[in-house]
Every structure is written in structure tokens, then in C-alpha cells.
Amino acid sequence: MGLIFVTGGAKSGKSKFAENLLLGMNNGNQKNIYLATSVAFDEEMKAKVALHKERRQDKWLTVEGYKNFSETLKDIFSDETKNNMLVDCLTNMISNIIFEEYDINWDKPSEKDFEKCNISVEKQVNELINIVNRFENVIIVSNELGMGIVPSYPLGRYFRDIAGKMNQKIAEIADEAYFVVSGIPMKIK
């Protein structure tokens, strides 16, 4: 299979679909790596992470991180087996990278601010793309943000735009792509 991109709205069932899809690809000798990109910074996010972990049970090896993937996954790469990996999710990864840029005034961001974030986000997305070939199968999950209203504030518009561009980048190189709506996956590539 190679690289598979799974997108959909919030609570659309995309993670559950991606998890089941990847488990079905395991040849019996592979590890199922779950690269969790969320940072649990409040109670709601902690509960969401706990729910995901409970659903995965012991079928997965969870690795947490949203950047510097060669370093984050170095222990996985020491194994000669071409394992499978699920990245959940690209939009969380992007938001974490954006919020590392503490010196940006998001009420009045400049073009330089956007360029700075673009460089940081693209660097990490490219690093993620570069490690894909070290796995048998990789599924990248991301939120589809471009179907709603135009955000009324600069940070919201920027996030929607950069996430959309990175979704396009992954979808373009993916071997397959799925759009999940109300728990129903539709193959779009």
C-alpha cells in the first residue's frame, strides 16, 4: 500500500477508520506504531487522548511527538522490520508547531510572521514525508478544514490555509486517500 491519507471533519470517524485499516495491513510480524501528535494541555484534550488509548488497547506501540521525527522514532528504526505507522494527526502537529512561535502577535501578524511559521511547518512536514519509506505502510490522518466558514480572525485563517496546503501536499504523494463522513470512508484516490 505505502502512504495513505485519511481526512474528514471533527468526530467524523477518520481515526477509527485509519486504525482499523492499518491493523488489517499487518503481516503478523510488524509493530503497529501510533505516532500521536497531540499535546494534552487541558482536561478535554487529556480525556480525548485517554479515549484514543483505550480504543487502541495493546495492539499499538504509541510514540508521542509532533516534530523531529528521525529523533522521535530512532528506537523504532533500530528494528530491521519494516513496521506500519499511523500518524494522528497532521492538523494537531501543525497547530503545535504554530504555537511554538511565541513572539507572534496573532491579533496583527505580519507577512514575516506567516513566513516564519510556514518555514517551521513545512520543515516538519517534509521530515515526516522523508521517513515514510522506512515503514511498510503509513497512514496520515488530518482534519479537513476548508469546508466551513471563513474564520474571522488572522490565526484561524492562517491555520486553515496552512493545514489545507499541507493536506494537499500529503494527498498528492499518497498512494491512496480517503474522505470520512459520519463514519463512512469514501476512497477519493
Q: Residues of each region from the PLM?
A:
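N-terminal/domain-start segments enriched in small and hydrophobic, helix-friendly residues
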Residues: M1-L3, E80-K82, E136
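Conserved P-loop
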Residues: G2-F77
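Structural motif
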Residues: F5, N84-L86, I139-V141
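Short, glycine/serine-rich, charged loops/turns that create anion-binding
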Residues: A10-K11, V39, T91, L145-G146, ...
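Residue-level signal for inorganic ion chemistry
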Residues: A18, H52, L86, N143, ...
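Residues at the starts of beta-strands that form the adenosine-phosphate
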Residues: Q30-I33, N83, N137, E176
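Conserved inter-motif catalytic segment of the P-loop NTP-binding fold
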Residues: E43-E127
